[in-house]
Amino acid sequence: MISKALYPTEGPLLMGEVVNKVTEASGNEAILVTDVGQNQLFACRYFKFTKPRSIVTSGGMGTMGFALPAAIGATFGAPERTVCMFCGDGGLQMTMQELGTIMEQQCPVKMILLNNNYLGNVRQWQEMFFNRRYSFTPMANPDYELIAKGYGIPARTVVDRAELDDAIRVLLSTPGP
């Protein structure tokens, strides 16, 4: 099961696969910052740590939107380390105005949006406990790449597995956000 989540050969990109590739490309040295939801579950499960104080998360508090401002803080608290932020589309919409702070301060946050077009964790609970009675879980998302570029932040949308390694390499090697 774990190998299918980390090394799929077909189908759409999986959250575990993306997290695993980012942690490998960062040399297992980065600070992980997560939001709330499925992205948090996958990031905490598959991100590998080699140093203490390498994870910033709100735990089970349910604070959607936590990741972006927390990642900004992590860049100030540990300026010598790479900060990788994993966030879902729902959480990013809660605090994406902080992209302005990232632009202003040139915070070198490496932002990875795991966009599944749902409030994924909420939908999962509706499947498990509410007989698949879905309520307000699909997301009508804006063009996140365009928004980031509007703030002067380099951005790239990746949906093809063949592009993933190069996109991560560019993300981690680009100075600034």
Annotate the PLM regions.
Residues M1-A74:
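Active-site diphosphate/adenylate-binding microenvironment
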Residues F42-P177:
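Thiamine diphosphate
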